[in-house]
Amino acid sequence: MKIFSESHKTVFVVDHCPYMAESCRQHVEFDMLVKNRTQGIIPLAPISKSLWTCSVESSMEYCRIMYDIFPFKKLVNFIVSDSGAHVLNSWTQEDQNLQELMAALATVGPPNPRADPECCSILHGLVAAVETLCKITEYQHEARTLLMENAERVGNRGRIICITNAKSDSHVRMLEDCVQETIHEHNKLAANSDHLMQIQKCELVLIHTYPVGEDSLVSDRPKKELSPVLTSEVHSVRAGRHLATKLNVLVQQHFDLASTTITNIPMKEEQHANTSANYDVELLHHKDAHVDFLRSGDSHSGSSSREGPFKETVTLKWCTPRTNSIELHYCTGAYRISPVDVNSRPSSCLTNFLLNGRSVLLEQPRKSGSKVISHMLSSHGGEIFLHVLSSSRSILEDPPSISEGCGGRVTDYRITDFGEFMRENRLTPFLDPRYKIDASLEIPLERAKDQLEKHTRYWPMIISQTTIFNMQAVVPLAGVIVKESLTEEDVLNCQKTIYNLVDMERKNDPLPVSTVGTRGKGPKRDEQYRIMWNELETLVRAHISNSEKHQRVLECLMACRSKPPEEEERKKRGRKREDREDKSEQAGKEHGTEKARPDADRLKGILERGKEELAEAEVIKDSPDSPEPPNKKPLVETDETPHMEKSKGPVSLLSLWSNRINTANSRKHQEFAGRLNSVNNRAELYQHLKEENGEEVGLTGGPRTAIPFLKCPRSPVVNRMETTENGKASRQ
């Protein structure tokens, strides 16, 4: 649909009644530039402009800015109202320039203060303004011709800016009612005409101007909708520079303009040709020139002397101009500019400098860091443009290194998985139409976006951020859970994957956990599995809204995560045992700074671990998942412990492990009596044989001898032998 906004047509209605000839009472020094006055000469008295002159100058400044920035498709029609309406130009492009308007205003001349005020009225101009808005412009006619049968789609909107001296608020309401009734009548006429267009939207801007020093009889009022077609706003402004400032603000509002102040412009002084001073020049342009670096938060705004909400201006610093016009800059946009104070010396110097083929680079002022060149001023075909330069990476530059991202090193990224991800989500031509469940046509591009969204709901980029995507056992589940719908076979495969993970946890299989950037051995095995289950649950929950079968997969996962109490007890004991082993290893490594523990404490710890192992074995035996152990003979414990030499220094890891093995073996059988009572590994045989007189003798009647105790493998036969009362060895 072709729409012409309110900015396409602007009608100025300026009051030419006798009271507009009154002075604005803002004095201007006439000969203030004369530096060397001859003594005895009386200076010229200051002058003041009339309300008419202030209104014409302000409206011409409005038109100048608009023509500078929008030379096409933004049209102005000028009407002077006194005893009748005088239309000074038309909507044709040939009449849209300041020279035509100023020549027409010169023929009108200033208002006659001696004319009859009763014969003059601003209503004549407002009625003529509505009539002018109904006329078709060249651009509207071209659009209607192109659309042909859809010509009614071309919109007709406009804006009326009326500068007058109202008597009161009731007078303002009367003017608004007049415009509303006139629009209603002319829309009826335009409906039956091929050369007129109905007004769809009209903005009425009433500006009440009065001399400086007087009280205003009209109050300001923001924009208000009077009807579906007409909106109105009222501004009460003092004449002189205040009126010029108000219209400067309005032109920014009406055409979406923004302000940029160029600072530190070096210019040579007239009085001192060898020195230079820095000046500032304020420029107006379309606000899109600030969009890019306003989003990045790099803008530095400063307040100017203007009033109203548009007093903010973006400050840019002058850089050394580049004289090489062949050098290319990566430019993202170019916008026409218009100086705010076009007649000032700094503005004139800057304009001439640019029109002579020079370019100026502009940088953002920063307190620290390197400078950022964000804009450039240059002329093309006699018109000056503000170019927006890209301060970020250019598509012409090399892409950023992957090491600058969140992963750091290149090897930290899941590059292989990402290649597979791109292969699964590549775009291909799709010619055959497909339909959704609700019988609506499925757009291939939207379907591709939807699939990409599903695949990226949970997709870690770095290897160290994931566990399940590093496990081959999880591939069957991770590959199908992203589907829009699952089959029964898919659900079965997901359940098998979950059961395999449960079996891995029961067997205490290691997981592929990355230890990059961590010290020590990393998290415990129990903690690794807890992280794995949490991540798997996150992946499944991200897709449970796809279908009901996705919910079944989640239910299976949650059911397998809930472990029986005996399993939790076994894991708890295992964690305690690992903690004690870690402490023992740490004590062995730090033997240079710590003393060895007493022998009794070490033996006590070994015995406690042995008891816990036995208790854990009983728990495993009672577990329904554990196999039945083979039948063994009951073990007999002894209350005696083998004599161990007391350590005289730090205890090594080998000593701790040997003591633990020896202690565990000593609990599994009854020690041979000879070894228990041996002295220096020598056992005396037949200790209980005595003569009748109490002397000890051997088997041959001679003195008893000591037989060295041989270190031989223990066997059930040897271990179960003992002496009897009559001195003969018996086997049990």
Curated annotation (Swiss-Prot):
Keyword Nucleus assigned to the entry: answer is yes
Q: Which regions are flagged for Basic and acidic residues bias?
A: 564-648
Query: InterPro entries this protein is in?
Result: Cell_cycle_regulator_Mat89Bb (IPR019355)
Kindly list the places in or outside the cell where this protein is found, as annotated in its UniProt entry. Nucleus; Cytoplasm
Residue positions, PTM Phosphoserine: S623, S626, S678
Q: Name one GO biological process term.
A: regulation of mitotic cell cycle
**Similarity section:** Belongs to the Integrator subunit 13 family.
The entry's free-text remark on domains says: The cleavage module binding motif (CMBM) mediates recruitment of transcription factors.
Protein name (Swiss-Prot/TrEMBL): Integrator complex subunit 13
State the species of origin: Mus musculus
The gene for this chain is: IntS13
